[in-house]
């Protein structure tokens, strides 16, 4: 186990991220889900919660830049998880919506996410989790100031 300190904090965060992505890739494969990378999950989650969205709104909600979102949407569209639909009121605008294929994998994605979160916070009390979340929120605000 890594002892986290100021000198390896960013390394530790990256290591955690890589381990979680590897877990997600393994679980997606085990469930027979292909064409989705772990970094695409937030896009599908946002669309599931918010419904059909304009590309610009999806960009804002995902905190990713437009070129990244465009590439992710193209990938998800190619694999049948989302569709692009021109806005009925303004043909310049593109709406993104999940497909039936995305809806069918939702239960597996929720199960994978729940299992991962349960393991991630195993052994932490409610108070420890609250402290962790408060500290990470403060760190996130500090990063926003960079």
Residue ranges of each PLM-predicted region?
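Charged, amphipathic alpha-helical coiled-coil/dimerization segments
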Residues: 26, 74-137
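The alpha-helix within a helix-turn-helix
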Residues: 59
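Residues within helix-turn-helix
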Residues: 55-56, 67, 74, 94
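N-terminal leader segment of winged-helix/HTH proteins
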Residues: 1-34
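Short, locally clustered residues in the helix-turn-helix/winged-helix DNA-binding domain
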Residues: 45-49, 137
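Pre-recognition alpha-helix immediately N-terminal to the DNA-recognition helix
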Residues: 23, 42-45, 104
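Short capping segments at the starts of secondary-structure elements
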Residues: 50-54
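C-terminal regulatory/oligomerization modules of transcriptional regulators
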Residues: 1-3, 127-146
């Amino acid at each position: 186990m890594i002892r986290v300190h100021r000198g390896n904090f960013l390394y530790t965060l990256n290591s955690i991220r890589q381990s979680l992505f590897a877990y997600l890739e393994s679980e997606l494969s085990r469930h027979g889900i292909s064409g989705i990378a772990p970094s695409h999950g937030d896009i599908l989650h946002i669309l599931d919660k918010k419904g059909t969205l304009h590309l610009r709104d999806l960009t804002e909600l995902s905190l990713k830049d437009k070129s990244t979102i465009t590439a992710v949407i193209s990938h998800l569209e190619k694999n049948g998880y989302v569709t692009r639909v021109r806005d009925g009121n303004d043909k310049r605008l593109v709406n993104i919506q999940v497909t039936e294929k995305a809806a069918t994998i939702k239960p597996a994605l929720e199960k994978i996410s729940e299992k991962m979160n349960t393991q991630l916070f195993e052994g932490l009390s409610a108070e420890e989790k609250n402290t962790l979340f408060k500290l990470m929120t403060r760190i996130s605000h500090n990063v926003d100031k960079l």
